[in-house]
């Protein structure tokens, strides 16, 4: 019998490997797993985190899938926000600017002559929200009383009215045998705050 002679060629068969990029978002959400063929383009995920600005990755995400599994972590910077105080005619209060999520110490109440502070139009949060906010003071006008000591003359009813309102002077008191010469101090045109 004849021996077979001749060359045989063998071709290698390849299957492309898949690798994984594990993205740790560091925002309280689950890891993002990107598994794909070696050499294929990688699209980095877009991440958000309330109160923070995304600053990039702890190491570069390659443009195409490498021949290794890799893990990257998101890098975040905390944002600052401001609470402004519209005191609505009251004493000035400096705005509070601080990091998101930090404890807020409410300022002292504003003051306003002739008024009582009744609070803010919305609650001051316990921790800094992820937004700038403005709160507005709410006021109630005070009432004051002017009393008259007629020093032996006819009685005059005290005047009680809101701060800043126009005062109508009372009729002069009378006293038998005397002529009224006026009050020891001038009656103001508008109700004072004291």
Residue ranges and their predicted role:
Residues 1-194:
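Secondary-structure capping and domain/repeat boundary segments
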